[in-house]
Structures are given as structure tokens and as C-alpha cells.
């Protein structure tokens, strides 16, 4: 009988991955979802990007791009100051401008690969830009490129939103990680449809509700780690997997 075992085809960009213990690998494609002022999305972002226990020190200032339509978010100002992000890398959401950033990073990555080097790690943070439909209306736009193809250029993308349903299907299905605060049953139904790999929906719903029961607590979903599901301290949750 013929041996029809599927053999792995090596993608050169696979070597650009940075495996990490207990947190999602880089490059990461993450969604952080929680209600405004009642969750702690900005606090999560500061912890992730400033502390060495997470991603602190893994991105050079000139390779960090902060996209936000909220000029008054003090925590984002702290983030920009602490990371020494250039002013030219801080901007409101604009499809054209973000496309220019993506094209620039992709060109630089291609030059590095041609020279036999790994692309530098880049980070794009898109903070609370979903209320105007920027993360959902253009399914063929730059956000889709970031979540579908950004890994080839070693681009990590983190998007925050108040509702999971505000994200496009492309973003939702291409996430490698998510941090989810408590939400409505309607939102949870959509999350369950996308992110439940357990034996039953009931088990996933129970895990979600238990993980998000306390104020500012959340569920971590990390597809790069065994078991997928983690609590607010990034510790694995016992499941049927």
C-alpha cells in the first residue's frame, strides 16, 4: 500500500517565531475584549508590553506603532512614554496610513530575508477603534492583512475592543490569542462558536463564567500553548482537552 502520510512543507517564516513559556508566542495576533472602564483592557496592555515577564523589551521603540482614536487615554500615554515610541508612530486609525505602515514593514522584512537575516519584530497596537466600524467594515483591508499575513513579516498585532462582535470574521478566525473579560450571553454565544474546542459548549461557557466571575478577571485563550485555556494569572485551566 502506498505511503500517503502528509509531509510537512517548511515555510521560511516559521523560523521567525519566538516560542515563549506560559504566554502566546511571537508574532502574536491577539484580541483583548472588555467593556469600557469596567474591565481593564488598558491595564492588560501595559502589563503585556512593559513587564519582562510578558513582552517587555522584545520590541524596539521605532518598531512599535500605537493606533488610537482616544486622545485622552492616560494609560496609553504612559505606555508611549515608557516605551519611548516616536511621535510619528502614534496616530489615529486611518486605513491608508496603516496600509503604508504595513507596506513599509513588509518591504523591510523582505530586504532582511534577502540578506539572510530574520525580520525585526514589529508591533501594531490598535486600541478601541471598533466603535466606528473600522475593525469590521473593510474585510479586505489592512487589518485583514495584519491578521492573515503579518506573521510572514514578523508583525505582532494586538487589537482591543468593547465587544467581540465588533471584530471582523477575518480577525476573529486568525487570532492566535485572546484575552476576554466578562460579557453578555449574546457575545458569549459568538465567542463560544469561534473558540470552543472542548467536548461541549456547556463546559466552555462554565469555564468562561468561572474565569471572569471576579471584577477585572478574564479568560486567556492561547492557541500556541497546550490546553488553550488559561486563567487571569495565565495558569492552565483543567478541561476535557
Predicted feature residues:
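Conserved AAA+ ATPase small/helical "lid" subdomain
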Residues: 200-240
Amino acid at each position: 500500500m502506498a505511503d500517503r502520510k502528509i509531509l510537512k512543507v517548511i515555510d521560511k517564516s516559521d523560523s521567525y517565531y519566538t516560542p515563549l513559556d506560559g504566554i502566546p508566542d511571537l508574532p502574536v495576533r491577539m484580541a483583548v475584549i472588555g467593556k469600557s472602564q469596567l474591565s481593564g483592557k488598558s491595564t492588560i496592555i501595559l502589563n503585556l508590553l512593559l513587564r519582562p515577564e510578558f513582552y517587555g523589551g522584545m520590541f524596539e521603540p521605532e518598531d512599535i506603532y500605537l493606533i488610537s482614536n482616544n486622545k485622552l487615554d492616560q494609560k496609553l500615554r504612559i505606555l508611549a512614554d515608557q516605551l519611548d515610541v516616536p511621535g510619528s508612530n502614534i496616530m489615529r486609525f486611518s486605513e491608508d496610513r496603516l496600509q503604508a505602515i504595513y507596506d513599509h514593514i513588509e518591504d523591510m522584512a523582505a530586504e532582511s530575508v534577502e540578506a539572510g537575516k530574520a525580520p525585526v519584530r514589529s508591533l501594531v497596537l490598535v486600541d478601541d477603534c471598533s466603535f466606528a466600524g473600522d475593525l469590521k467594515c473593510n474585510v479586505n483591508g489592512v487589518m485583514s492583512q495584519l491578521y492573515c499575513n503579518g506573521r510572514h513579516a514578523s508583525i505582532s498585532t494586538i487589537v482591543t475592543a468593547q465587544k467581540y462582535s465588533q471584530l471582523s470574521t477575518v480577525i476573529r478566525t486568525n487570532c492566535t490569542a485572546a484575552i476576554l473579560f466578562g460579557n453578555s450571553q449574546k457575545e458569549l454565544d459568538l465567542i463560544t462558536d469561534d473558540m470552543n474546542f472542548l467536548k461541549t459548549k456547556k463546559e466552555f461557557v462554565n469555564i468562561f463564567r468561572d474565569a471572569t466571575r471576579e471584577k477585572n478577571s478574564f479568560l486567556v485563550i492561547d492557541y500556541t500553548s497546550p490546553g488553550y485555556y488559561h486563567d487571569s494569572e495565565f495558569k492552565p485551566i483543567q478541561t476535557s482537552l
